[in-house]
């Protein structure tokens, strides 16, 4: 029985780790033009807007991070980290956008309950996540991209650890300006 369990678990572990490594290969490179997107989402500060696209952020730095699921421990930690530093990002001409497979209702609840003060976008089929090498069905992988005001990938973080990630992104942003 033990061998049966091990023989079943090992392929799943290898598949998960390989996909995580492979996402690095499929993610846009620094200097590439950022893939365009048009996604529905939620921002509690902009009640009249429900759809966002890359061109909405033209002329500003964009921190675009992909994450697996609203309300999970790591995702909440990462989201709150960006929320706490939102003013610092704004002072540096940067917007923050989080993308996951969750729907708008989930994003609205997540923003309300966890005081998230920036835009969360819904990518339920992973089409945009996949363009950024960030899709491990049925979830987005935890990757972050810093997009320059002219729409190019300026920096990328693959398979992010959420603790202090927002501070790390802010420090890189400050060096880029």
What is each model feature region?
Residues 38-61:
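A short beta-strand-turn-helix
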Residues 35, 61-63, 141-143:
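Short loop/turn microsegments at loop-to-beta-strand junctions
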Residues 66-87:
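Conserved redox-active cysteine motifs that mediate thiol-disulfide chemistry
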Residues 16-41, 55:
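N-proximal helix/coil linker or "cap" segments that precede and/or mark the start of modular domains
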Residues 7-17:
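Bacterial N-terminal signal peptides
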Residues 60-62, 67-71, 103:
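Short pre-active-site segment immediately N-terminal to redox-active cysteine/selenocysteine motifs
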Residues 140-177:
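Thiol-/selenol-based redox modules, centered on thioredoxin-like
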């Amino acid at each position: 029985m033990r061998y049966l369990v091990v023989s079943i678990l090992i392929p799943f572990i290898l598949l998960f780790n390989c996909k995580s490594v492979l996402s690095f290969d499929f993610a846009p490179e620094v200097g590439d033009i950022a893939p365009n997107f048009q996604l529905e989402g939620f921002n509690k500060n902009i009640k009249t807007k429900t759809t966002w696209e890359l061109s909405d952020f033209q002329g500003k730095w964009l921190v675009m991070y992909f994450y697996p699921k609203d309300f999970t421990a790591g995702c909440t930690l990462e989201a709150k980290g960006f929320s706490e530093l939102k003013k610092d990002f704004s002072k540096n001409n940067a917007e923050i956008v989080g993308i996951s497979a969750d729907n708008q209702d989930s994003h609205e609840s997540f923003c309300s309950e966890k005081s998230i003060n920036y835009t969360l976008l819904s990518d339920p089929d992973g089409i945009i996540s996949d363009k950024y090498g960030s899709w491990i069905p049925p979830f987005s992988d935890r990757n972050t991209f810093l997009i320059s005001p002219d729409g190019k990938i300026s920096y990328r973080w693959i398979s992010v650890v959420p603790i202090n990630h927002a501070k790390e992104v802010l420090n890189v942003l400050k060096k880029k300006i």
